[in-house]
Regions:
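N-terminal, active-site-proximal structural segment of metallo-dependent hydrolase catalytic domains
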Residues: 1-86, 90-92, 96-102, 106
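Generic structural signal for well-ordered alpha-helical scaffold segments
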Residues: 52-59, 149, 185-189
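A short local loop/turn or secondary-structure capping micro-motif enriched for an aromatic residue
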Residues: 20, 128-131, 167-169
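Short capping/connector residues at structural and topological boundaries
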Residues: 23-24, 122, 169
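Beta-strand-turn-beta hairpins that frame and shape the catalytic cleft
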Residues: 2-10, 22, 116-117, 140-162, ...
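Soluble or luminal CAZymes and related metallo-dependent hydrolases
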Residues: 43-51, 140, 176-183
Length: 191
């Protein structure tokens, strides 16, 4: 995005499983909450450091941080709150996040520079897919799409933070991706 005074950066980063550390298992073969092996406080802290370092490199390269940052594969609010306290964000960034109904607990989020961005509204867009089971615990869901309206220098910006279902298992999720993309297109055309 460019205005007459300066160039602003917008970024998207799939942080690949930014989950809170697991409690130590009783037995080494016990399943973990995150689903990751040996996901402890040390590895979690290292992951946060590496993510913040990526943005430090962007700052050094571009002489500025992105004013808007879409993130995917986050589990919950706490990792985001911890990330924005670190260098180079230094608590100057706000967080927009909603817990999704994704079976792995994977969410998307938006970080924004509080000195440049005014949040007007935000909402998760949740998708349910048909299954032959009426028990809500068995619904086929995926991560939410995050829709935000923000204001920058008097201009309204509409954003969708999207992390589509993966292309795994012979692309079983293609109909889901197609449905979500069609829905987003319809929403964009109505803006």
């Amino acid at each position: 995005m460019t205005n007459t005074d300066s160039k602003e950066l917008i970024a998207f980063y799939n942080v690949e499983n930014l989950f809170l550390p697991d409690s130590p298992p009783v037995h080494k073969l016990d399943p973990t909450v995150s689903g990751l092996r040996n996901w402890d406080e040390k590895r979690y802290s290292n992951k946060l450091f590496k993510i913040s370092h990526v943005f430090q490199l962007i700052k050094e390269s571009e002489n500025a941080l992105p004013m808007l940052i879409g993130l995917s594969e986050i589990q919950g609010q706490k990792p985001l709150d911890e990330l924005v306290k670190m260098d180079p964000f230094n608590s100057n960034y706000g967080v927009i996040h909603y817990d999704s109904m994704d079976e792995r607990g994977v969410d998307v989020a938006l970080l924004y520079d509080k000195s440049k961005i005014e949040v007007i509204s935000s909402e998760p867009i949740t998708y349910f897919f048909e299954i032959d089971d009426e028990d809500p615990a068995n619904y086929d869901t995926t991560r939410d799409i995050l829709f935000c309206k923000v204001k920058y220098s008097g201009e309204m910006i509409n954003l969708f933070v999207v992390h589509l279902p993966s292309k795994r298992e012979r692309d079983v999720n293609k109909p889901k991706r197609d449905h979500i993309l069609k829905d987003i297109k319809e929403k964009v055309l109505k803006l």
